Amino acid sequence: MPGIVLIGAQWGDEGKGKATDLIGTKVDYVARFNGGNNAGHSVVVGDESYALHLLPSGIINPNLTPVIGNGVVVDPEVLFEEIDGLESRGIDCSHLKVSEAAHIIAPYHRTLDKVTERFLGKHKIGTTGRGIGPAYADKINRVGIRVHDLFNADHLHDKVEASLHQKNQMLVKLYNRRPIDVDQTTEELLKLGERLKPYVANTGLILNKALDEGKTVLFEGAQATMLDVDHGTYPFVTSSNPTAGGACTGTGVGPTKITRVIGVSKAYVTRVGEGPFPTELLDESGEWLRQQGHEFGVTTGRPRRCGWFDAVVNRYASQVNGLTDIVLTKLDVLTGLKEIPICVAYDVDGERHDDMPTDQAAFAAAKPIYETMPGWDEDISDCHSFDELPATCQAYVKRLEELSGCRISVIGTGPQRDHVIQINSLVD
């Protein structure tokens, strides 16, 4: 009954696909539990690369069942675009299961997301403009539309009317926009519902039965720990819970069925969008990391902000998620550096902080306290055991493990699927 949670331990884009590749052939189900199409991930199979934003990575594998859980906000138009794109390349998507309780991103959510960001100006959050936040806001305000609402015309019309009552007032009076037509929106959603219906299921029941039967389920988180709406750098966060607890609330599976929690971290740190980032490099070192690591967003194409490894963040991620293992990715990017700084603590107004400040103003003011490790020049992409790594590289990894408070079980040594060192198995 292995329930394995896979999460990002930093600000996202950590390369969770490395871990998914290692685990994917050993699992029966892959379940997305949070977020929407605001997060991109790439799946490589042979010589083919697939860029996905909403579909679980398991969609490529016909031998397992991909699941979109109730904690995900689903944009049906984006979902169908991804399905059509995969099917045009010979990938069968008929085994996909979508939770009937998942909330829908309607066209008006995207509209509100974009106009609100423009209205906020310099105070903007830095969203992707894909309607994720407004859809989650409707969920919390109890005016959201769920997947099963798309199959009853009268019921759906009432839900859309209730949802747009206040939104149209805002669009007209605050944003100087035209109101959104209730009837037209209802018709559009009904048509989307017709196509979505074959994929819809009681996914909570399916996953619990699978675990009870001894099947292995991989719970796949979007975004990452530091973007969690409760535990991240609020308000510069996403609108859901990408931390391990979200795997339970976002799928309907109880915490006692989770046996492993795997956190993925880069050997340095990146972030996209607004918000504090203590180790950010605004000089040529940051640009060097960006170019060497090809740090540009899958979803937005935006250049990622880059910085040195932050052990305070990783310790926090280990604590919040209860990590059992760390997958360390992109270690090869650091090859060629004579010295590699590691942030071991923060200086906040002259006081040393070894742990994450709960006050975000303090975190924004935090200055990194660095410890410097010697680098290496050797190409590590062909190393397939820890002992094959250069001595200074081994020392760097061991220090990150010590500072993070969790064992490093897998190391990514290059961009290809086989550029990996597995120290401990990720599946019991």
Swiss-Prot record:
GTP binds at residues 12-18, 40-42, 304, 330-332, 412-414. It catalyses: IMP + L-aspartate + GTP = N(6)-(1,2-dicarboxyethyl)-AMP + GDP + phosphate + 2 H(+). Pathway: Purine metabolism; AMP biosynthesis via de novo pathway; AMP from IMP: step 1/2. One of its GO terms (molecular function) is adenylosuccinate synthase activity. Mg(2+) binds at D13, G40. Substrate binds at V298, T299, T300, G301, R302, P303, R304. IMP binds at D13, E14, G15, K16, N38, A39, G40, H41, T128, R142, Q223, T238, R302. It is found in: Cytoplasm. It holds the Pfam family Adenylsucc_synt. Binds 1 Mg(2+) ion per subunit. Its cofactor is Mg(2+). GO terms for cellular component: cytoplasm. Transmembrane segments: none annotated. It comes from the Bacteria. Keywords: Cytoplasm, GTP-binding, Ligase, Magnesium, Metal-binding, Nucleotide-binding, Purine biosynthesis. One of its GO terms (biological process) is IMP metabolic process. The active site is at D13 (proton acceptor), H41 (proton donor). Plays an important role in the de novo pathway of purine nucleotide biosynthesis. Catalyzes the first committed step in the biosynthesis of AMP from IMP. Belongs to the adenylosuccinate synthetase family. NCBIfam families: PRK01117.1 (NF002223), purA (TIGR00184). This is Adenylosuccinate synthetase. It comes from Bifidobacterium longum subsp. infantis (strain ATCC 15697 / DSM 20088 / JCM 1222 / NCTC 11817 / S12).
